[in-house]
């Protein structure tokens, strides 16, 4: 989209989403404020591009300085969950199978108290919630029986919100191919470390 000449033109918050510190663990939309970023805090960036009437949604994270032990636990859980989604999103599987696999992975590792949700649709609306990537059936929101086929695109998303520690958010477009998938965003899942 960027190469085609996209613009920043849509958002839930009236601007791009930027949050730091305690504002990263709310798990909701995060409009920019006058809060000053502090050393040792997570910084969350959620950018919304548009080309024509097709929308994009990419989130990434940074940390100001090296993470402490608690932040490292959140980072590790977040990165491993992101990698798990990419690993299991394959043609021929259902969204419910993928959601169940990732949910069981999260629960098995003890992360279910702070990792929720795994993806949403994207297209003409910023959050086309149908079909949400989950193993739970919610009317007008999910279809766990939807079979993933080549050329299907899902906005994979992970939020890891630990109150008192910080929050991370990943949103990336994942294109299903004949043999697997391709992440259309090349940013790493690991947060950028920004030193003073």
What residues fall within each predicted segment?
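Active-site neighborhoods and metal-handling regions in enzymes and metal-associated proteins
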Residues: 1-196
């Amino acid at each position: 989209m960027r190469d085609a000449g996209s613009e920043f033109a849509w958002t839930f918050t009236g601007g791009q989403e930027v949050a730091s510190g305690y504002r990263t663990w709310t798990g909701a939309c995060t409009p920019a404020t006058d809060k000053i970023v502090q050393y040792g805090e997570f910084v969350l960036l959620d950018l919304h591009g548009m080309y024509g009437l097709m929308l994009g949604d990419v989130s990434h994270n940074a940390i100001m300085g090296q993470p402490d032990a608690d932040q490292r636990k959140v980072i590790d859980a977040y990165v491993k969950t992101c990698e798990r989604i990419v690993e299991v999103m394959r043609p021929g599987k259902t969204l419910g199978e993928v959601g169940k696999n990732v949910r069981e992975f999260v629960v098995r590792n003890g992360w279910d108290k702070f990792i929720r949700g795994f993806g949403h649709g994207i297209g003409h609306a910023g959050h086309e919630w149908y079909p949400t990537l989950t193993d739970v059936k919610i009317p007008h929101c999910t279809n766990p029986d939807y079979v993933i086929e080549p050329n299907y695109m899902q906005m994979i998303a992970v939020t890891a919100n630990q109150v008192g520690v910080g929050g991370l958010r990943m949103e990336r477009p994942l294109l299903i191919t004949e043999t697997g998938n391709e992440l259309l965003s090349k940013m790493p899942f690991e947060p950028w470390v920004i030193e003073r």
